[in-house]
């Protein structure tokens, strides 16, 4: 196996004001392409789908976090079209509150592996995820209070984007470039106080990663 190659990202915290929001994402060129998007918004509205370059993305999960009045979701697309394309998020009605968006490209990936989702627990919220050799983990967290850290694995603070959706969101945290050994990996999320969620997704590597093809840049 080989670890997936991290590519381009977009972070946004807009207020759509309509029943969709769209932006341009530049998918990196290379074998084993993968595009993911992490979303959080008020649970007054629902996601009705995402598409990239006109191709429908697969919904991994959508969760109504009633205690936080938020709806969190994860969509992905294997072998997406490369280059600059429109990523569109559709809603069941106009959205008048800010939403949290994080999209990321990969190459050299066999797609999505295991995932785990745990609602608000007293900080720190520590959970495990069983992964394959050379996988990466992405994590997101939501709280009434500020997100302090997202640790992948526990003890290793990872950078993340901070968004305000009328709740506090930490999104886009990802493992270091070296990936993980196969087994159970501990992921910790913390907030300044109170409760915090812990959602995590495995990004598979590949046994035939193309580490030389196309345009990409590394996001540490």
Predicted regions and their residues:
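Primarily extracytoplasmic/secreted proteins
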Residues: 1-220
């Amino acid at each position: 196996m080989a670890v997936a190659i991290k590519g381009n990202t977009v972070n946004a915290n807009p207020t759509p004001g309509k029943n969709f929001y769209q932006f341009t994402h530049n998918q990196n060129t290379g074998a084993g392409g993968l595009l993911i998007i992490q979303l959080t918004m008020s649970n007054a509205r629902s996601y009705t789908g995402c598409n990239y370059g006109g191709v429908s993305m697969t919904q991994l999960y959508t969760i109504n976090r009633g205690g936080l009045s938020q709806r969190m979701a994860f969509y992905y697309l294997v072998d997406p079209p490369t280059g600059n394309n429109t990523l569109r998020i559709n809603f069941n009605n106009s959205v008048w509150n800010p939403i949290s968006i994080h999209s990321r490209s990969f190459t050299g990936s066999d797609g999505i592996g295991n995932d785990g989702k745990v609602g608000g627990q007293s900080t720190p919220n520590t959970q495990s995820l069983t992964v394959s050799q050379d996988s990466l983990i992405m994590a997101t967290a939501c709280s009434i209070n500020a997100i302090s850290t997202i640790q992948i694995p526990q003890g290793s603070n990872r950078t993340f984007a901070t968004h305000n959706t009328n709740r506090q969101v930490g999104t886009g945290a990802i493992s270091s470039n070296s990936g993980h050994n196969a087994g159970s990996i501990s992921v910790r999320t913390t907030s300044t106080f109170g409760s915090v969620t812990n959602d995590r997704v495995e990004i598979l590597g590949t046994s035939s990663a193309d580490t030389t093809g196309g345009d990409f840049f590394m996001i540490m």
